[in-house]
């Protein structure tokens, strides 16, 4: 559900950006990577009324986590520059997954062209 909701926000933002461009209204979607927050420690604040949670392993990402203040700077600059996508990771996941996804889409379009001529 989590990944599907993120994909929905991205898709909705793309369509909204396209539809509002004629009115000179920009829409940006933040696609953050690891941010230096206490999200992995949030379990200690979980109310007991929510019941027990599932065990999970906390990833060691402290060395690559971005400072929230730096994220805020990037977001503000991205909005000012009317960027459609605002990323916080210029390497790794972002630079590998996006080209892989585009390649799969192009392959499927090529397949379709072969079917319909």
Per-range role (PLM):
Residues 2, 10:
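Catalytic tyrosine of NAD(P)H-dependent dehydrogenase/reductases that use a Tyr as the general acid/base
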Residues 5:
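Active-site helix of classical SDR
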Residues 13, 24, 108-111:
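Enrichment for repetitive, rod-forming helical segments
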Residues 18, 22-90:
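SDR active-site lid
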